[in-house]
Curated annotation (Swiss-Prot):
Chief site of localization: membrane
Binding site for ATP: G757, C758, S759, G760, A761, G762, K763, T764
Pfam families per the UniProt record, alphabetical: ABC2_membrane (PF01061), ABC2_membrane_7 (PF19055), ABC_tran (PF00005), PDR_CDR (PF06422)
Protein name: ABC multidrug transporter G
SMART domains: AAA (SM00382)
Membrane disposition: Multi-pass membrane protein
Family the UniProt entry places it in: Belongs to the ABC transporter superfamily. ABCG family. PDR (TC 3.A.1.205) subfamily.
Cysteines engaged in disulfide bonds, as pairs: none
Function: ABC efflux transporter that seems not to be able to transport azoles, nor rhodamine 6G (R-6G), a known substrate for many ABC transporters.
InterPro entries tied to this protein: AAA+_ATPase, ABC2_TM, ABC_transporter-like_ATP-bd, ABC_transporter-like_CS, ABCG_dom, ABCG_PDR_1, ABCG_PDR_2, P-loop_NTPase
Lineage, broadest ranks: Eukaryota, Fungi, Dikarya, Ascomycota, Pezizomycotina
TM segment ranges: 407-427, 436-456, 492-512, 523-543, 550-570, 580-600, 659-679, 1056-1076, 1085-1105, 1121-1143, 1166-1186, 1193-1213, 1226-1246, 1318-1338
Compartment(s) where it occurs, according to its Swiss-Prot or TrEMBL record: Cell membrane
Location of the ABC transporter domain: 51-299, 721-963
Amino acid sequence: MDTPSSGTIDLEHGEAGLRKRLTLTFRSVSVHVTAPDAALGDTLLSVADPRQFLGFLKGSRPKRTILKDVSGQVKPGEMLLVLGRPGSGCTSLLRVLSNDRESFDEVIGETRYGSMDHVAARRFRQQIMFNNEDDVHFPTLTVNRTMKFALRNKVPRERPDGQGSKEFVQEQRDNILSALGIRHTTKTLVGNEFIRGVSGGERKRVSLAEVIAGQSPIQVWDNPTRGLDSKTAVEFARLLRREADMNQKTMVATMYQAGNGIYNEFDQVLVLADGRVTYYGPRQLAKSYFEDMGFVCPKGANVADFLTSVTVLTERIVRPGMEDKVPSTAEEFEARYRQSDIHQKAMEGFDPPEKLTHEVDELTAAVASEKRKRHLPRSPSVYTTSLWEQIQACTIRQFQIMAGDRLSLIIKVVSAILQALVCGSLFYNLKDDSSSIFLRPGALFFPVLYFLLESMSETTASFMGRPILSRQKRFGFYRPTAFCIANAITDIPVVLVQVSCFCIILYFMAALQMDAGRFFTYWIIVIANTLCFMQMFRAVGALCKRFGNASKITGLLSTIFFVYGGYLIPYEKMHVWFRWIFYLNPGAYAFEALMANEFVGKSLQCVQPDYIPYGSGYPGSESPYRGCSIPGSEGDVILGAAYIRAQYNYSWHHIWRSFGVIIGFWVFFIVLTALGLELLNSQGGSSVLLYKRGSQKTRSEDTTTPVQEAARASHAKQSTFTWHDLDYHVPYQGQKKQLLDKVFGFVKPGNLVALMGCSGAGKTTLLDVLAQRKDSGEIYGSILIDGRPQGISFQRTTGYCEQMDVHEPTATVREALVFSALLRQPAHVPREEKLAYVDHIIDLLELRDISDALIGVPGAGLSIEQRKRVTLGVELVAKPTLLFLDEPTSGLDGQSAYNIIRFLRKLVDGGQAVLCTIHQPSAVLFEAFDSLLLLARGGKMAYFGETGKDSQTVLDYFARHGAPCPPDENPAEHIVEVIQGNTDKPIDWVQVWNESEEKQRALAQLQTLNARGKADADYVEDTADYATSKWFQFTMVTKRLMVQLWRSPDYVWNKVILHVFAALFSGFTFWKIGDGAFDLQLRLFAIFNFIFVAPGCINQMQPFFLHNRDIFEAREKKSKIYHWLAFIGAQTVSEIPYLILCATLYFACWYFTAGFPTTASISGHMYLQMIFYEFLYTSIGQGIAAYAPNEYFAAVMNPVLIGAGLVSFCGVVVPFSQMQPFWRDWLYYLDPFTYLVGGLLGEVLWDVEVRCDPSELVRFRAPLGQTCGEYMAAFLAEKPGYLVDGNATACEFCQYSTGADYARTFNLKERYYSWRDTGITALFCVSSYAMVFLMMKLRSKKTKSARSE
């Protein structure tokens, strides 16, 4: 066995020489998918088109073949390199070989693992690992914790020298990280695009380390070197080679821009074109096979790029005289290959899979020896560790993730404390009399409601990290069930802290029963109920593939469970058709248990206004001539048990039954979540182009109009860009860290400058500093354009193509370019000329065929290479004076990379100045650059100057100083390796450069360029911050957003469906409300229920808003395309038509079913107020989102603001008269929901003629000699209500005679108050939208320019 120091990682320490080896055989494999080459993007109307559904039923969807008749065999110890252009089927083949077939409709042919077919191989899922291109990890975990988790789930039973599992994990972690060169990152967070962590190249190596930790005999790698510099990429290929040689691994990989150093490590090569095999055989023969066919491989070119270029007519080089003899199409190449000797020998060299049963037997024994002793004796498991050990590992990791995201935890706990303080002060010191009879159930229902709303954020959270779960499930690290149970376990301590803080504050502030047993009963029930709700919303997320559907269901469930929790409508009052929901609601059981726990054993005194009649002339204490209006009362005493029995049908005996039911629901939701995650399929499949509906594919035309001629002739002003003595410092662990050190350089018009260096040298940092994209740190030195300081218009007049291609997915290519041109070219340029220039750029970048294609997202939209071209186009249509590009060829295949550089060369030859960071360039790509700026570690310069013809100038420089380049080596790779110390004797290249003549010449040239720029008499400074007016920006962004909404049917339809369903549900819940005393309360709750349409809609709206904000902040704000005011203005205005539509639908489905007045003036007023509410909650949600750092933060903040702030103080939960004076005197009047409810409630109550049901009447006797009418005359003169029979002596009294009497208890003293409140609601809508602008302004302040001195 090899030692770790030699760079080989061997985790297989099984005894008796058991090794895991498998031969991978695939014969005549073909793959079919239903996705066509191009599809039409969905719109609001298209998804509702019945013809689509009918077509689907008929099965008329076309099929497409993405792999055809592919065969091969990879034996243990061998490495196969799969090559092909994007779309040729490389990734699809790798998915099939890794036994990941779910994303394909049909896979024909045979795939064998040893002697097993693909069905039998499923039980060895973790022995066939697939590493895809994506580097998605939990960003708040360190590299150490990420690796330890992977290894913890792969600890074999038998370990060398009796080594403990902890020592084993530690040793293997060190070996793997050392082999990949990232051992120094163990304490660094993995991070992502939002959380700072390791670099992109290091994150890629963490992904590679995770697969290596799995130690599977078959390893399938999809573009594993993307984002790595050439030296690291070659080292990784050598690591795979050692793994294959020493541990007999079977390796299959596809790589883009694979240099010759990588290519030479492989044994066999499989070349694909359009899903067909153009070559399969030994690597040594591949180049000569195509050269013999008549193709020429350029000097210094990557052989891998040459093999894939032969099928590209515009790029291949054919030997003179062979033009008519070489094949052109994929079919011709395949036919030629099948007739070759190489094909015959390859097929004859196959070991028959049927004879490889010994491999499967050895694998079965080896896997069995790995299993822990405690593993359950059942059918062979794909997992190394037992379920209990998986749960342990997942639980530890979950706690580590939470520890890394302390902010969310703190927010949860602080929110609970704030909510409890607010709620406790609302229900402060409840009295033991009938005045608290309405408040006490409110105080008990509040924790149920708050934690219901707060748990909704779990649906959002369940979609974060889903790709990680799918990947690690496939790797066999753990069952999703273990992950699910671990989540449930880690909920417990968080909920304990959260609920304890909440309960202690609320319970004692509200002065609920002062009994330890009752407090702890209250506490444990709220904890169980909270856990149950959290798990329920997590289950919703697990069972839904799309977030839109999950948020819709979440919103509906929160409304349903709120209404049927037993608080708004007691069980006996529920309509029979929805009563069953009560039994399925965990919150209903919690509320019953809390009510019984509080009321049983408690006696309340019946006092006025509930003890009737009262006032002067009536008895002041208990009397047979007075009656109590509270159900379950006897005389002037209300027995708690009798009250909850009469009003709610609750019983003391149900407390622990309810607790048991809640725990049962919790377990059920855990099982449901586990089931959803177990059935969750990994996403994948072929990419598909989406076209705008109504568009046609267009071809380039040669005819041009005079306007187009003018547009092409008018190029941007050509400028020279220089920088000198540039230093950049950032704060790091309380000190300053220098990232750039005395860097200088220049870019002239017509010059293409390459910025190169090893990984972590500061290439992107320098580009960000030069382009004014840094918002922190300190910059020193000079950055000049034409010898003058960068002006205010610099960011707008320069183009910057970032590594991440950030675009609005629903826009077409042409729309994205037109948007940029209209907003970034000066306002005085005619619109026709701008559009003509867009056409010119579309032709220049060869985008004509896809100009009407939607940009989309990877997998459903443009390919990576097409997206790069669109990014370039978006910047070019602005006519920039200078163009910056960060890694434009990263992640592309050789031909696509060549295309991008070819386009840049076109631009440069037209006078454009371009500065471009690049790594892993082939010799052909490097040849296209005019100059090179080389950075060594620490941001220090190692070279700046011309490259020369065939890169001879720069190679001579390094040769003179002791590092000559071998004849066949790629110059770019040689230069980068040399400055990293790969020379015979150590050379300090930074010092060599500082002492060189080349540096002095470059500095002299820089001074000359600056002096020439300053002397330009024609220079006119552009002082405009933005190219166009704010009004024009607003109209353009609004138009784009309206199109985006039209093409986002999921978002809009989910909002519409949520409203329609909630309205019908509410309408039939409160069906034809009557005119009894309790029916007045139902009218109030029907309106109160309408308010709860907001949480679901806000939860769905915020990710949409944040997505748009991220695009704005990542690219459009930095390029000064438009102002943040235009962004917020457009966001608010674009939603308005859909909000009015939603209000209309809700009104139509709810108002009439609930039986509200049909008078036009009343119904019209209600409709108007409902529209205002749509505006109100949307603006509040957008205000939270405008400042929130991410979706989860926003989802956690929603219940705090809506629950603590708005619902609590509007006078419904606690009526105005019973509210604490502290809140009543100011916050009640500042709460927009106060006026919202007032505007709605006054109209539907005022004219109601109340007729009490017999059960609602207060009964008492009149004194001897008096009728009820005579006895109550004084009381009725001052107070509301009526007597059923004034002439009787056994009095029956109803508390209200009209709805107006009830309305006055809610501070609606006059009829006009409802219109007054509607006007105030409108003002609150305006102020809420103003808050959105304010929040964005506060956030925008953070992104300031770094100071330059």
